[in-house]
Amino acid sequence: MVKYLSQSEAINVDQELFNDYKFSVDQLMELAGLSCAHAISKCFPTDKYGRVLICCGPGNNGGDGLVCARHLALMGYTPTIYYPKPTAKPLYENLSHQCKLMEICRVEDCPAINEAASNFDLIVDALFGFSFKPPVRAEFVAIVELMQQTTLPIASVDIPSGWDVEKGKVNDSDLEPDLLISLTAPKICARNFKGRYHYLGGRFVPPALQRKYDLNLPTYPGNELCLKL
């Protein structure tokens, strides 16, 4: 059975990828975001879910969302980015610049529920990653509340926003995504996931690292970048 990682284990795996295996942050982010786009395309085809609101947070999870937006655009979707607190670092500025030159729309204000329902078919939740600890900060409350209340399907990147990485939902009102894309390996909170689709993405974990942490990851079929758990 595939291993579900604690918060500390997820951090340690990431640090070993960076420090021991010499992966760069942007290298892993590109692979993670690309795998998210592939998982979304498998579950939500463009003919029914072409208009996508991608909600990006300030850290690596948000970076994954920016990469995902670019690849979804190349796949024929019409992504719109909501990025309430951009990170002032070259990596994130470059990702934002790429999206701008790809003519991907960006909204400055969180859409109201009715506005979101009229303008979008799907929401991608790329706000918080496995380093998140509740409660949600003030600048993200509006978008988290939108995702909690909307009837649109939601695809969460690695961790559903607002969830505790190990305990899962903190409150009964916390969002319930339709698709969860676990990156590298699923986190403990994913055991509480009740949505329709659970995918694994991030096909970059070296065999030795898999053995060290007993990840027991399933084998990706052929040239697939994601697989259904």
Curated annotation (Swiss-Prot):
> Is the Cell inner membrane keyword given for this protein?
no
Please verify whether the record's keywords include Phosphoprotein: no
Query: EC number(s)?
Result: 5.1.99.6
Cite a single Pfam family from the UniProt record.
YjeF_N
Reactions catalysed, semicolon-separated, are: (6R)-NADHX = (6S)-NADHX; (6R)-NADPHX = (6S)-NADPHX
Residues recorded as binding K(+), renumbered to this chain, are 61, 125, 161
Q: Which Gene3D superfamilies match?
A: YjeF N-terminal domain (3.40.50.10260)
Q: How is the cofactor bound?
A: Binds 1 potassium ion per subunit.
What Gene Ontology molecular function terms does this protein carry? metal ion binding; NAD(P)HX epimerase activity; nucleotide binding
Q: Which HAMAP family match?
A: NADHX_epimerase (MF_01966)
Annotated NCBIfam families: yjeF_nterm
Family assignment from sequence similarity: Belongs to the NnrE/AIBP family.
Q: What is this protein called?
A: NAD(P)H-hydrate epimerase
Organism listed in the record: Drosophila ananassae (Fruit fly)
